[in-house]
Amino acid sequence: MAATQEAETATNGAGHTPMMRQFLRIKAEYPETLLFYRMGDFYELFYEDAERAAKLLDITLTTRGESAGAPIPMAGVPVQSVESYLARLVRLGESVAICEQIGDPNTTKGPVERQVVRVVTPGTLTEDALLEERSANLLTAVAPGPKGRFGVASLELSSGRFSVLEAPDQEALTAELERLRPAELILPDDDQTPAPEGGCVAQRRPSWHFEYDSARRLLLRQLGTHDLSGFGAEELHAPVTAAGALLQYLNETQRAALPHVGALTVESRDEAITIDAASRRNLEIEHNLSGGTEHTLASVIDTSVTAMGGRLLRRWLQRPLRRRETIAARHAAVAALADGAFADVRSTLEGCADVERILARVALGTARPRDLTGLRDALERLPQLQILLGQLNSHRLQALGVELDEHPQTVDLLQRAIIDTPPATVRDGGVIADGFDGELDELRSMSRNADDYLAALEAEERAATGIPTLKVGFNRVHGYYIEVSRSQSGHMPERYTRRQTLKAAERFITPELKRFEEQVLSARERALAREKALYEQLVADLASELTPLQRSASALAELDALAAFAERARSLDYVQPELADTPGVRIEGGRHPVVEQALDAPFVPNDVRLDNRRRMLLITGPNMGGKSTYMRQTALIALLAYAGAFVPAQRAVLGPIDRIFTRIGAADDLASGRSTFMVEMTETANILHNATAESLVLMDEIGRGTSTFDGLALAWATAERLATRIRAFTLFATHYFEMTALEQIHPGVVNVHLEAAEHGERIVFLHAVRDGPANQSYGLQVAALAGVPQEVLKAAREKLRSLESGDGGDTGSAQLPLFGPEPVFPPPAQPEPEPDPIREAVENLDPDGLTPRDALETIYWLKAQCKE
């Protein structure tokens, strides 16, 4: 019988033991959650929970007697290793209610009192063993608002970072959820807002949790204020509603106050460059298109030496700012560190504990001894960091030096209270240092002197009994004893009382040894109780200093992120970008930050110039020639600049950018029933509706998924709208050579191409961007590189010659126009005649960018040209 069914009869107690009635009563409160029910040194699961856990964790499923006439399925995990099991369950999207023994088994009649102390869910993790150290673990709530708006609230319980924002529509909400990538999402049960894809666990909560007035009261109580104006949130009804619903969920699952959540950040969409969900995926900022983390921007840029610095750096990359003052301050700080100080800063920070998350556990009362030594070691580094920062010419670094503080009293307390290398938990003692507390020292002394006393007692009893093999010992079951062999046991004094009989020995106790046992065991118990009380008080004392300690933790994270930017600038030859007041993008010698690191050969740098007279670069050239790389590197350079980092270029000047759009690559969206072409058109529509004159737009191969004329017509109309109506700064790559005529029609459209050199039927990609349109597509040569069979290539060449001569033959499948006559496009722009092709090819060569094989093929090609 299932646990949920059994719970219905638990109240009358028929057929159930008292302990099982207790279990069923508690389980009834958490019907959808796995219940870890503490029994001694194990957490046990029963009924359906046991069967589910056995499958998910690959642990043994057994039974425990009978209840209501049926065997009870049971499985269990040791308390000592519970975190590893919780980690596996949470990764599978499960939630676990932790039910602890809160009564004393020695004084309780019947089942010991138990209660659920916490529900572990994917979005409420705080233990290091359950978290990814460089990724935020966010709990996010979404509340629908008026006029199609949405309120979004996010909390990282493991650090206390709490933020809200308002999304104006569904598209913006999707973009924000793609940026945040929450571990758990809270939605109202009466709303049709879809949960995002990608492993996020969605929880549907009662609609009354999303009632504004009660949500606002919860938020005010949490922040300890009577008004939200100081946080800039008083008028944000939907975000406040989301924040209150989030806090209601935490109240139910955590069963504890959250003192480390004392501030609220309102994120304005106008403060940051907007990047929609598709563009964020295409740019591969933290995750590649396969969902992994290799070959991403973060994998190249994040060399931070602390986990909290890495998380902050990734937030900066995910949310490049538009606020010039903040970005300029970061650039100045990176420049000051890059002059040499970054190495000293990083070596001082190396090995620093994750102070943000430690402080969260301090606030929640779950900090362990090694958390406190990690905090102590981190705080001991602050004076050296302050000295280093005081020598640097940067206002932001000077401010960070002040925010670090030195916390001398806290450092002194931790140095006196905790031993250098404490055990993992305080359960068995040995955490508090000698000399910290007189009472504890006295109790420990009594226990430690026991060995000397027992050695003396053993010598006395041997002399008194004349038995040289007599020994005094101890075990946990019977306590202290005097042991002699069976053959000698009949001659013991009357004061000896038999305690235990073994196969070859007898064990006795004497009144003197009994008194000593009571004193020692009492001293040990009292010492352990005293140590636990001292530890709890120590954690409470640290919690009272939470706000200044959190400020220092934030400063440490920011310093680490800035030092990582500086290290990348020095190691990878990045330059400080210039921020201009006038719109435009000018990049000299730009490089793709990720591709550059993945190549064995030197990366071929290229220039980009977009301004009022060059609003659109129409890019042609062969597949594999580097068009997509060229476009992506432009967007990534802009993103890095506005995140506060230096950029891979010889020079970069960037004007204001409000949005970055990328329409690069596409695949079928099978889950939503959308074809590749439908995905492409949806993304294109989003760009045409939302791009502005200050947007950076990347468009790659629009119109590939339909017929040639349809695709060309759509690409032409899209490019015209971007160039003439929207006037966004656009990189537009195409294989439709007819589109190069746009340069002759619309001012601001400029043709550029990716260069390649041909040798017979082979092609060498030079990856250099040149003005003017490409003179051919090299499609057959690329097909040959891909391994297309020679017979197919031969047939393709014959068909190509036929098509180019105008005699394409009657295929019998002419396309009928859907809306009228097929469009008539202006003739494509013709490339200027090349007076000396050999000279032109040599001038355009980049020797450093050629592999040995490319160089050899180029030489053969040049020789063939000379013969002609």
Curated annotation (Swiss-Prot):
Manganese listed as a keyword: no
Keywords of this entry: ATP-binding, DNA damage, DNA repair, DNA-binding, Nucleotide-binding
Keyword DNA-binding belongs to the record: yes
Region feature (Disordered): 803-852
Record PROSITE patterns: DNA_MISMATCH_REPAIR_2 (PS00486)
GO molecular function: ATP binding; ATP-dependent DNA damage sensor activity; damaged DNA binding; mismatched DNA binding
Residue stretches of biased makeup (Pro residues): 823-832
PANTHER family (alphabetical): DNA MISMATCH REPAIR PROTEIN MSH1, MITOCHONDRIAL, DNA MISMATCH REPAIR PROTEIN MUTS FAMILY MEMBER
Cited function: This protein is involved in the repair of mismatches in DNA. It is possible that it carries out the mismatch recognition step. This protein has a weak ATPase activity.
HAMAP family: MutS
Protein name as annotated: DNA mismatch repair protein MutS
Organism: Halorhodospira halophila (strain DSM 244 / SL1) (Ectothiorhodospira halophila (strain DSM 244 / SL1))
Phylogenetic placement of the source organism: Bacteria, Pseudomonadati, Pseudomonadota, Gammaproteobacteria, Chromatiales
